[in-house]
Amino acid sequence: MCIRDSIKEGVTSIAVCLINAYANNKHEKNIEKLLRKFGFKGYISLSSVVSGEYREYERTTTTVIDSFVKARMSNYLNSLRDELKNLGFNGNFLVTRSGSGSMTFDEAEERPFETIMSGPVAGAEGAGELSRQKNNINMLSLIHI
């Protein structure tokens, strides 16, 4: 499907994955510029930006996942941010990373694939913190995925 047809069909996200982009992302960047030149206003996920992985399959699947969830994550985080502000929250807006740790809402919008398994990670971190607060009692935490 050409770029104009994609725009007419209402495509909102595009994943760009070229086989050697991990070594040189010049062509992926050129495709991004071309998409913008033709008027594509949606989300573009470049495999060279999403993952520096040299393995094509892993880089491609991660980029496709990123492209698939990016619009949804952006809409969700913007709605959540607005609602929290309306409720008077003026602290830091943070999201749990899949690999532990946290990221800002803006980072999560740019790299939503890094949040995919954040629920189980947050559960494990929460159980560990509870154990520490209870003087390191022996604890068993079950996390269902």
Q: Which residues does each PLM region occupy?
A:
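Conserved small/polar residues in nucleotide/adenosyl-binding loops
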Residues: 1-6, 143-145
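Nucleotide/phosphate-binding catalytic cleft detector across ATP-hydrolyzing
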Residues: 4-138
